[in-house]
Amino acid sequence: MSIFNYFLKKEKKSSASLAKERLQIIVAHERSKRQQPDYLPLMQKEIMDVIRKYVNIDEEQVIVQLDNNEDCSVLELNITLPE
């Protein structure tokens, strides 16, 4: 029976380490969300409203990305404009 228990314990450790890895990924993802400023969604909406005054675009055609470096933050907007 001790050999059988040995293999069962390994599966539990493997499962635990897998769960730990998944939790670390979730925590890292949540931390990255917190790093974006609170005003970013409102700013994105206002920029979209201004662009819509001149060009008809969908929300899916806009990609907003915020990159934080040590010295500065860069807000990047990629908008696919119709022809």
Curated annotation (Swiss-Prot):
It holds the Pfam family MinE. The keyword Cell division applies. GO terms for biological process: cell division; regulation of division septum assembly. It comes from the Bacteria. Keywords: Cell cycle, Cell division. Prevents the cell division inhibition by proteins MinC and MinD at internal division sites while permitting inhibition at polar sites. This ensures cell division at the proper site by restricting the formation of a division septum at the midpoint of the long axis of the cell. Belongs to the MinE family. This is Cell division topological specificity factor. It comes from Pseudoalteromonas atlantica (strain T6c / ATCC BAA-1087). The lineage of its organism: Bacteria, Pseudomonadati, Pseudomonadota, Gammaproteobacteria, Alteromonadales.
